[in-house]
């Protein structure tokens, strides 16, 4: 089955516009998913909204969004009021500015999406926008209504296409960088000439290998599928595996641990 686009609209840079389509770069379709079942009847359990105080079900047309003022009071907002704050980014990715590629820290990146031309007429404009960003070493910044909310997005030329990243909101990113940078003092072991650094560098060299997608394969999914297949065939489930306990030995220092690690790899 062909991948279905999750969004269609227009990519715009100043007066240059082209129709585009977009789909998530990652998928959860291969993930094992479960439903909650009534053990007694075998029927599926469904959820519904109920009043927190009375417990009575609340019909769809009686549900409204509210912003909490305190524990028991809310500012209610109607759909019309929420729609009034929407911008023109529902169907147009209007690149507002460009920033040097690599200048945005990893912590801002959220979810990747593939962006591509939606018809043959827009292929040339799309290709020029992509190539110009690549040649200049820049990425584009825009805003887009996606998944029912407006998001800041980054457009990155990659290969022959463009990857659109949703970005975290400014108030969602913690200030001050990594906590370790503020709390951990520098160590002499971190210097390039220290024995610890030399041994760990040697260990890294021995364990370096080309990237392979199998490195991020989820073994839990495979075990779940095995259990499900066994249940379907009427077999008993396999006993739960016990987590392997790390070997402690007599290692009492970083240097001893590194030497022991290298020795396991056949070096001394």
Swiss-Prot record:
Residues 174-194 are annotated as: Disordered. SUPFAM superfamilies: SPOC domain-like. GO terms for biological process: DNA recombination; double-strand break repair via nonhomologous end joining. The keyword Transmembrane does not apply. One of its GO terms (molecular function) is double-stranded DNA binding. Residues 13-175 form the Ku domain. With LigD forms a non-homologous end joining (NHEJ) DNA repair enzyme, which repairs dsDNA breaks with reduced fidelity. Binds linear dsDNA with 5'- and 3'- overhangs but not closed circular dsDNA nor ssDNA. Recruits and stimulates the ligase activity of LigD. Homodimer. Interacts with LigD. Belongs to the prokaryotic Ku family. This is Non-homologous end joining protein Ku. It comes from Gluconacetobacter diazotrophicus (strain ATCC 49037 / DSM 5601 / CCUG 37298 / CIP 103539 / LMG 7603 / PAl5). The lineage of its organism: Bacteria, Pseudomonadati, Pseudomonadota, Alphaproteobacteria, Acetobacterales. The gene is ku.
């Amino acid at each position: 089955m062909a991948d279905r686009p999750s969004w269609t609209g227009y990519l715009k840079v100043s007066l240059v516009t082209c129709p585009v389509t977009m789909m998530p770069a990652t998928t959860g379709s291969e993930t094992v998913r479960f439903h909650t079942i009534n053990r007694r009847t075998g029927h599926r359990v469904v959820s519904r909204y109920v009043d927190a105080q009375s417990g009575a079900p609340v019909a769809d047309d009686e549900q409204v969004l509210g912003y909490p003022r305190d524990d028991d009071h809310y500012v209610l907002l109607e759909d019309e009021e929420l729609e009034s704050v929407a911008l023109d980014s529902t169907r147009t990715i209007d690149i507002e500015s460009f920033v040097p590629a690599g200048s945005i820290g990893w912590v801002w990146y959220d979810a990747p999406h593939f962006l591509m031309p939606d018809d043959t007429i827009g292929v040339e404009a799309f290709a020029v926008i992509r190539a110009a960003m690549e040649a200049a070493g820049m990425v584009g910044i825009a805003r887009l209504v996606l998944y029912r909310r407006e998001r800041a997005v980054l457009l990155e030329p990659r290969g022959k296409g463009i990857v659109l990243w949703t970005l975290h909101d400014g108030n969602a990113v913690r200030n001050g960088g990594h906590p370790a940078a503020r709390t951990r003092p520098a160590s002499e072991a971190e210097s390039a000439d220290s024995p610890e650094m030399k041994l760990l560098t040697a260990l890294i060299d021995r364990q370096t290998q080309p990237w392979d997608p199998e490195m991020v394969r989820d073994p839990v999914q495979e075990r779940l599928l095995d259990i499900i297949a066994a249940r379907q065939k009427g077999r008993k489930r396999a006993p739960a595996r016990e987590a392997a306990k790390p070997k402690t030995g007599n290692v009492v220092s970083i240097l001893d641990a590194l030497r022991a690690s290298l020795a396991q790899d056949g070096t001394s």
